[in-house]
């Protein structure tokens, strides 16, 4: 064989190897609610990029934003079944009360404790891992949206005073027993109202306020009818990176670690950003003429103390005694 032929043969062999590698590259579909170009969609794309780079192209994560693969509750079922590989979205909590831990009031009160508890080794991450394992799902990380609060169409008298009885009716979501009991202990009246009716309900005075989201969410949906925003820090809103467990198990241990590390890197980066993002949303509210009420750490601890000692015993059934015990143990509460 001439030198020229040897070069050609070598080139063909290398090309064949590359093509073989490409042929065995695996594409995983990841669904998210986030709109194209949003911070959440960018986080999903960064996760995809990290996985692609670190697996040297063995795994490609294709991101489908804006519920392109279906409503998020449908996608949740599809990930369980393996029809969709991955998602970055809320957890569907209806069929397992342990997952109420993701919005349980005052499971944490600040960004540092939320990050610790929502990362591998943390109490809430562990509880969620155990709960969704039964459904064929594995959690990889959490994309933080921010701390929760309540928006009102009216002024709120002394919102830190949990002994004051107010003539304000706050909407809680259907099934939102946890926050119904919390708000009533904090001196508010409550009413259940479907999401589709909430804007009109606040506008017409059927209810005076709403709870269950972040300042950013309130700006998106209720900016023009919100007069007061109270940053209760009652829960931490986040989307979960989840993957079908069988699909995850089919990957090599090295690639499993790459996916987990990439999700955790994106999650950690977001935890560094989310406090500033919340602060920015609060500033936007102030600029729009909305009265913004925030609390110092001592006041938040006092609110959390009331919730944990007086509200938690009433809503323990929403979580289950064993799961509540795990949460209390992680917080050093007897």
Please provide the spans of the model-predicted regions.
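Bacterial N-terminal signal peptides that target proteins for export
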Residues: 2-12
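Hydrophobic alpha-helical segments with strong N-terminal bias
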Residues: 5, 94, 128-129
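N-terminal secretory/targeting leader peptides
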Residues: 12-14, 26-115, 132-133, 138-334
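Sec/Tat signal peptide C-region and signal peptidase I cleavage site
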Residues: 19-25
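Hinge/lid segment of periplasmic solute-binding proteins
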Residues: 119-136
């Amino acid at each position: 064989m001439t030198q020229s032929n040897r070069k050609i043969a070598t080139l063909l062999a290398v090309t064949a190897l590359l093509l073989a590698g490409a042929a065995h590259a695996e594409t995983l579909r990841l669904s998210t609610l986030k709109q194209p170009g949003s911070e959440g969609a960018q986080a999903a794309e960064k996760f995809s990029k990290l996985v692609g780079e670190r697996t040297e192209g063995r795994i490609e994560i294709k991101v489908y934003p804006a519920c392109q693969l279906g409503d998020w509750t449908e996608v949740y079922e599809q990930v369980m079944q393996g029809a969709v590989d991955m998602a970055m979205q809320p957890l569907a909590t209806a069929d397992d009360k342990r997952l109420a831990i993701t919005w349980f009031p005052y499971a944490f009160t600040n960004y540092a404790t939320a990050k610790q508890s929502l990362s591998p080794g943390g109490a809430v991450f562990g509880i969620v891992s155990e709960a969704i394992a039964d459904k064929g799902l594995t959690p990889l990380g959490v994309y933080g949206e921010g701390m929760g609060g309540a928006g009102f169409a009216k002024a709120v008298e002394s919102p830190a005073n949990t002994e004051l009885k107010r003539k304000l009716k706050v909407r809680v979501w259907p099934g939102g027993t946890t926050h119904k009991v919390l708000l009533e202990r904090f001196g508010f009246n409550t009413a259940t109202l479907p999401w589709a009716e909430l804007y009109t309900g606040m506008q017409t005075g059927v209810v005076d306020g709403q709870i269950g989201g972040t300042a950013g969410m309130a700006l998106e949906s209720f900016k023009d009818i919100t007069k007061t925003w109270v940053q209760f820090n009652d829960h931490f809103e986040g989307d979960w990176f989840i993957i079908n467990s069988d699909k995850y198990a089919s990957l090599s241990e090295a690639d499993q670690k790459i996916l987990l590390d990439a999700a955790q890197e994106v999650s950690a980066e977001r935890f560094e950003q989310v406090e500033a993002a919340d602060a920015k949303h609060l500033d936007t509210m102030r600029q729009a003429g909305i009265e913004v009420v925030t609390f110092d750490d001592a006041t938040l601890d006092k609110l959390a103390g009331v919730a944990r000692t007086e509200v938690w015993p009433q809503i323990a059934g929403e979580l289950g005694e064993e799961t509540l015990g795990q949460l209390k143990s992680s917080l050093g509460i007897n």
